[in-house]
Amino acid sequence: MLDAQTIATVKATIPLLVETGPKLTAHFYDRMFTHNPELKEIFNMSNQRNGDQREALFNAIAAYASNIENLPALLPAVEKIAQKHTSFQIKPEQYNIVGTHLLATLDEMFNPGQEVLDAWGKAYGVLANVFIHREAEIYHENASKDGGWEGTRPFRIVAKTPRSALITSFEFEPVDGGTVAEYRPGQYLGVWLKPEGFAHQEIRQYSLTRKPDGKGYRIAVKREDGGQVSNWLHHHASVGDVVHLAAPAGDFFMNVAADTPVSLISAGVGQTPMLAMLDTLAKGQHTAQVNWFHAAENGDVHAFADEVSELGRTLPRFTAHTWYREPTEADRAQRLFDSEGLMDVSKLEAAISDPAMQFYLCGPVGFMQFAAKQLVSLGVNNENIHYECFGPHKVL
C-alpha cells in the first residue's frame, strides 16, 4: 500500500499532467523506442504513428493518478489492459523497462525533484505488480485449459473466404493437430506475423467469429487503407501458410442465461465479435428475444448477411434490421437492407423494451457513441450496455 505522503505527492502532479497532455506519452514512447528498440517487435507501430496509443497511455496515467486512493475503481481498466497484454505476451521484466522510461520522462520534461520521482516510482511499482499478478493468472488459466498453450502456437490457414469487398475470413487449425482452447463469445485472437519485407514483427488482435468447436478458430479481417497487416493477409496470405497465435483473450464477452434478452448492435467490421455471440445463442437454444441490428455503407461491404439469416432462423425469437447509409441501385433492387441512412433504434423500441435486455455494441467509436446515446434516451440502463473498441480503448 502507498503511504499518505506518496499519494499526496502523486496527486499534486495531476494539473501538470493534464496541462501537458499526450505530449508526455509521446516523449515517453520516443525515449523508450530509442533506448529499447526491441520493443518495436511488440508494440503496434501503426497506433504509434496515428497517436492512438499515446493518447490511450496518457489517459491511463491520468486515471491512475486521479484514482490512486481508490484503486478498485481502476480494476475494470486493469482487466482490459491485462487481457490485451497477454495477447502481446508481456513479461514482468518489461515493466521495469517501462518504469525506467516513465520516470526518466517525468524528470526530463518537468524536472520535478527527487521526492516526486520517488513517489511516482512507488506508485508505478504498485500498479505494475497489479498487472504482473493478473497477467500471470491469465497465462496460467490459458495454459491450463484443455487445448490451451503458453506463448504462441503455430497454426495453419485452412480456409480463406472473401465475405465482402473489404472483409475476408480466415480459418486456422493447429499444426500439431491437437485440440484448441475454448473462449468466450466476443473475445479475440492474437495473430503474430513477420513476413518477408516487414521491418518488425506485427501483432494484431482479431475477434473470433463463431462458437468454439475445439478444432480451430475463425477470424474476419477488414482491409484497411494503409494497413500493413490487413493488406498482407488479404493480398498475400494463402491457405497452407503458417502463422503463430496467442491464446484467445479479452474482457468483452457475452455471458447470459437462456432467458436473458440480448441485442447485438454493430457497424461495419464491428459485427465480428457479434457473430460469435449470435452463433453461441443459436447453438445454445436461446429462448429469449435476440436482436441483430447492423449498419453498413452498402451491400458491397456488408459481410456475413447470409450466415446471420441462417442463424436467426434457428432462434425462436429473433429480430434483424439492417441500415445502409448509401445503398446502391442493386441494393434497392434486391431489397438487401431494411432502412436507409444512419441507425435509428427508436424505430424498433418495442424490440428493446425489456429492462433485462443486455446490449452489446461494436463498431467505430463515433457509431457506438451515437447508438449508446439513443439507447440511454430510450431508458436503457448504462450497466446493460457493453462495448468493444478495436484498437486502444476509448470511453463512450
Curated annotation (Swiss-Prot):
Residues that hold heme b according to the record:
H85
Task: Provide one Gene Ontology biological process annotation.
Answer: response to toxic substance
Where along the sequence does the record put site: Influences the redox potential of the prosthetic heme and FAD groups? K84, E388
Q: Which residues cross the membrane?
A: none
| Gene Ontology molecular function, alphabetical | FAD binding; heme binding; metal ion binding; nitric oxide dioxygenase NAD(P)H activity; oxygen binding; oxygen carrier activity
User: Which stretches of sequence are listed as region Reductase?
Assistant: 147-396
- The FAD-binding FR-type domain extends over 150-255
One Pfam family per UniProt: NAD_binding_1
In terms of InterPro entries, this protein maps to:
Cbr1-like_FAD-bd_dom (IPR008333), FAD-bd_FR_type (IPR017927), FNR_nucleotide-bd (IPR039261), Globin (IPR000971), Globin-like_sf (IPR009050), Globin/Proto (IPR012292), Hmp (IPR023950), OxRdtase_FAD/NAD-bd (IPR001433)
Cite the binding residues for NADP(+): G268, V269, G270, Q271, T272, P273
User: Any idea where the Globin domain is?
Assistant: 1-136
Cofactor: how bound: Binds 1 heme b (iron(II)-protoporphyrin IX) group per subunit. Binds 1 FAD per subunit.
Q: What class of enzyme is it?
A: oxidoreductase
- The superkingdom of the source organism is Bacteria
Recite the UniProt keywords alphabetically: Detoxification, FAD, Flavoprotein, Heme, Iron, Metal-binding, NAD, NADP, Oxidoreductase, Oxygen transport, Transport
EC number of this enzyme: 1.14.12.17
Catalytic activities: 2 nitric oxide + NADPH + 2 O2 = 2 nitrate + NADP(+) + H(+); 2 nitric oxide + NADH + 2 O2 = 2 nitrate + NAD(+) + H(+)
Cofactor(s) the protein requires to work: heme b; FAD
The active-site annotation reads Y95 (charge relay system), E135 (charge relay system)
Domain-level remarks: Consists of two distinct domains; an N-terminal heme-containing oxygen-binding domain and a C-terminal reductase domain with binding sites for FAD and NAD(P)H.
HAMAP family, alphabetically? Answer: Hmp
Q: Which family does it belong to?
A: Belongs to the globin family. Two-domain flavohemoproteins subfamily.
Protein function: Is involved in NO detoxification in an aerobic process, termed nitric oxide dioxygenase (NOD) reaction that utilizes O(2) and NAD(P)H to convert NO to nitrate, which protects the bacterium from various noxious nitrogen compounds. Therefore, plays a central role in the inducible response to nitrosative stress.
User: What is the protein name stated in its UniProt record?
Assistant: Flavohemoprotein
Q: Which organism is it from?
A: Salmonella choleraesuis (strain SC-B67)
